[in-house]
A protein has these predicted regions:
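A generic "cationic amphipathic patch" detector
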Residues: 17, 65-67, 139, 208
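Peripheral terminal and inter-domain segments
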Residues: 89-254
Length: 254
């Protein structure tokens, strides 16, 4: 066990940030004498034997750049370096702040709530060039607090909302993914979404799976004259697979 939790190899070239302290046997070395287990999406166990300290995080930070460094460096600064031999006195104000900070939050896109393009693109059908993901067309229907995406992919017409400004109620993502068995696509995941106008002609949205499986889609719509260009990235394990890359669509009259 001593060898497993001790630096056996260096990993400076292959990694960056907090992960450059070396690697043992299935354990990552931590700065200042600790070691850790690292799971997907910022699920960590940070262990410091000298301080008799273990910290567990169960975050889902997929798609958030530098989240791992932020979590681990905040731990070093605010917890490890603040350790004392005796317990701190009761501090109701600090406990109230901790309770507020510990509530789960989803990252919010900042931007404008509307744009002239909301009216211009409302209900317009955009037909895509041939693409590897099978998208044929998409249209966006804007209301006061949401935009409904309707699209055809692989011969199936589906739809889901992006809520403008704030996260709206949960909804079932229309494309089925794995449920109890990873090889059977029979489950629609519960999701939450939010969007905002980043530029006058650019709408940006997030879709987060908040079910037994966690993951997210980041999607950007850019409108120029009669075209809509989509850029999407997905951070998920074995689902949201078609929501990545670029799509170019042209407006057509129905």
């Amino acid at each position: 066990m001593m060898q497993a939790t001790t630096k056996q190899i260096g990993n400076y070239v292959a990694h960056s940030g907090i992960r450059t302290s070396g690697y043992g046997y299935q354990f990552w070395m931590q700065p200042e004498g600790g070691f850790s287990c690292s799971g997907m999406g910022s699920q960590y166990a940070l262990m410091y034997p000298e301080q008799d300290l273990v910290v567990i995080t169960t975050a889902d930070a997929q798609g958030l750049n530098n989240a791992e460094d932020f979590i681990r460096e905040s731990f070093l600064k605010n917890i490890l370096h603040g350790c004392q031999a005796e317990a701190l006195p009761e501090d109701p104000e600090a406990q109230a702040k901790l309770a507020e900070a510990s509530v789960l939050h989803l990252p919010k896109i900042e931007g404008e709530l509307t744009s002239p393009w909301a009216a211009k693109a409302n209900g317009v059908k955009y037909v895509f060039d041939d693409n590897r993901w099978g998208f044929k067309w998409m249209k966006l229907d804007f209301s006061d607090n949401a935009v409904q995406l309707t699209y055809e992919k692989h011969g199936q017409v589906d739809s889901f909302p992006l809520y403008i400004g704030e996260y709206g109620p949960e909804f079932l993502f229309p494309e089925k993914a794995a449920g109890k068995r990873i090889d059977i696509l029979d489950t629609n995941y519960r999701c939450m979404s939010q969007a905002a106008w980043d530029l006058e002609n650019t709408l940006v949205g997030n879709v987060f799976a908040v079910d037994d499986y966690l993951g997210c889609i980041k999607i950007q719509f850019t409108f120029v004259e009669d075209t809509m260009t989509i850029f999407a990235t997905r951070w998920a394990e074995n689902f949201f697979n078609d929501w990545r890359g670029y799509l170019a669509g042209h407006a057509v009259k129905e």
